[in-house]
Amino acid sequence: RVELTQDGVAYSNLDDLNTDITCFIENGFCRFNVNSHLVNINQQSPKQGEVLVEVNYAFSEQGVSISVERCNDSAYLVLPVIASPKEEVRISTREASIKKNKGILYITCEAGYIDVAPTDSDGRIFNPVPGFSFAPLRIIPESIGKKIQINIYFC
């Protein structure tokens, strides 16, 4: 999801009831284009007015690419990555990796940089429903209005 917090209120594209989603197959990729706005749970925009968000997903056998076009007004991509406290997590500004039982999950950042939201002492947040711990990654654009681009794959 794309999120913006302003005066303690979260505005997210997940809350937008007027989201437009298109799906198509192209060159072996299953693509989803999602056009929405950042709104709070009451469908209200931030004080500066409508904030348009375009998120594009490209799924392939190798993994998934996610891009956010024109990430405006201090918004960022929220990426909660499931990671048990026993799994080794490494995070830099351009790459994150989580060592799983059967391989390594990689997240590479081509545009923007990786940040970690506040966590518990083990570097994760526990969500009692559905019962998973996760590393709360945020992908921040280099500057307002810039693109975010990440790739996720498992080896």
What are these regions (language model features)?
Residues 51, 62-101:
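Acidic (Asp/Glu-rich), glycine- and aromatic
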